[in-house]
Amino acid sequence: MSGKTMAAPAADQKQIGTGEFIWYMVSVFFYTNMTGMVGQYRNNFLVDVVQINQHQAALFNTLVSVVPWVLNFFIVMYIDGRAIGKRGKFRPLVMLAAVPMGLLLFLSFWVPKGLTGALLMICLCTVGILWGVMNTFGNTVNNLAVVMSPNLRERDTVISFRGIVSAVGNSASLVIILVLGLIWKDNKALQFILCAALSGVMGIITMLGGMRATRERIAYENERKNPLEGFGDILRNKYAWNIIVSEFLKSFRGIANFMGTFLAAALLGDSSKFLLFGLPTGIGTAVGMLIINFLLKKFDSRVLYIASGIYSLIANTGAFLIGYTYFKQETSGGPLRIVFIVFLFLIGLQFGASNLLPNMFQADVLEDIELKTGKRMDASLGFVIGIFTMISGTVAGALSPLILYGDNSICGYVQGIQDGTLQSLKTKIWMLFFYTIFHGIMMFLAGVPFFFYKLTGARKAEIHAKLLEQRKTYDLAAED
């Protein structure tokens, strides 16, 4: 039996007002500020503040990847199968996740005094798993960009600006930590907990406010279907496989990301100065997205993504050579350090492509699947891609602490040293290698599957036009 969906406005008209656009971008900014803090600093908190050993860190990273993924199997079936009312498909889920995410962010950087051993690991893993689960609901704030307008040009504009705002928001915690580090220089634990509290409060307020101000305007066929069939539709789509393989390879860069705060301490003396790594990269990412938006008017998105992978390998190799020369000279300051930070900006330019274009590819694949099957699989597509990124991400997360520190590690990082410049030369160079060259190799490999991707240009426009006609056959009467 077919359900009812909200009415779809004319697809060739501008749909999104200025206030709605701004509110949406603000909510995305503070959402990615929260997720960015976990991504940037949680490992640093566990290694240098809580001081868990490398085997505990590997176990933690494995559990917080695998367990949420298993639970998400059921969550995404609920998301894609739920009835659509006046408030839309995704907005209620973001509002549901806002408060728990803010609280869990705080708990991610707070450990009760006296906890050790098994109780400590249970506490850490429970919070990490709950964070991963709630983030599945919260992440639907990104899905909202795809359904705010049926106008293809307007949709791509929202996706582009969402990517830029996400890149900046992802670096916001770096600024907060730097400021707190100037006030409480030798108290990392306090820096982390204050940053988490501030970021959590702002995330809650803006996610709730942003969802009240936005609308969803895509018409859906609401007939209930077996969600497992939807997974099969995705796995049978050849274009989806281009994205799946690419994202699988790209997720191995988690090893490089893991090294970031530790390398910043080795180069600059303190992990709170990771801002000087993250900010140039974040600015480069935002600039890179603007460049990509301009180049999309002249070049195929597939070609741009492949070219960005080649560029990433070149830029990261250049950064490694600069950093290697600096460490070998054992210089305490000087121009090489500045040149290295400039190279981080150049590396960030590639992030503009790797963050923006896959979102556009996924939006186009969603339309291809919907045209062929009549099913809208927003959450399920991300989940299927996530199956493979979970595998590579879990491997990367488990290997990262074993590579960084402990017995038989490659880098030989020593925990608890306040001045990171006192780490050995071997440690610095190996961390630098994984942060730069290894990252560049994975980004190059991530572009290879797109040699076989054809859903661009005229083919993309043809599918979108046919889909707009198909949506006219849906029951467009509004329903609570």
Indicate where each model-derived feature is located.
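Membrane-embedded alpha-helical bundles of multi-pass transporters/translocases
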Residues: 3-480
